[in-house]
Amino acid sequence: MACIENVLGGHAPSPTAVAAAENGNREPRPSLPFQCPKDDAGSWGHPGVPLRPPFKVLSDLARERLERPSERTGSCIPVDGWRALKPPYGPPPAVAEEPLATGEVNSSEGPAGWRQSGQDSINNVSQEFSGSPPALMVGGTKVSNGGTERGGSNAGLYVALPRGQGFFPSRGPQVRGPTHISTLRSGIMMELPPGSTRVTGKERLARVSFPLGGPRHPVKNWPRPMPLASSTTGLGSRTTAHCFIPPRPPSFNPFLAMPMAFAPPPIFGPPLPSCFADFPSWGMPAPASSNRENN
């Protein structure tokens, strides 16, 4: 009775379905005997064999292959336990000692060690772009391929590279001689003479020029007179009027366009009658000729 309850409850497949699955035929065989296992049995006809063998169970041949090094690869894997097969986390001890020693040296030197590491990286970059041995100076320390020279604690960075090599921005052309000191105030260029800027007395004179031309030649900035021939009747042929036309700026002119004033030429002719000056234009009397005709 208990056997039938187990079958109906779904704990095990029915004997009819088991027979059909084993023989490959889907037709049920009701003629098979119905057997009920005893209570001491493990399950319905299945022996108590584990699904997976234990991990530590190895044959003698496999143990010899693992313990002895192979002739081709020359590797040896110990089989003491699963910990030996597991790869260790992190670098091996020999590799881990090297950064540890480097850290100790840097910690003993302090900021000097950090500067040295930064210098090495910059030195590699500069050496990669330039073929010659570069000279590098960081924080007052000059580094070269030969040795190291330490100086004061300056905050500047000096990289000596030949011109046209590397991606460092090159400076402008350096002028060794004294240069002209020019200042631009309110649109007027003032150029001081070369030499010391501290001058006293009459030497404190500056040439003033407009910024239309070059700063070193202020005379060219002044407008040049342009003679214009007069076509007015009554004037001599030698009479000329001088007007100053400023040069045209190339792109931008800070000054507004100033109009050129010309004096009107004198008019030679009969003078106007004085009667028009005595009376205003709105109260002028009628002419005398018209009054005589009306009378």
Curated annotation (Swiss-Prot):
Signal peptide (UniProt feature, chain positions): none
Domain of life where this protein originates: Eukaryota
UniProt-annotated stretches for the region Disordered: 10-48, 101-120
Database matches in InterPro entries: DUF4645
Name listed for the protein in its UniProt record: Proline-rich protein 32
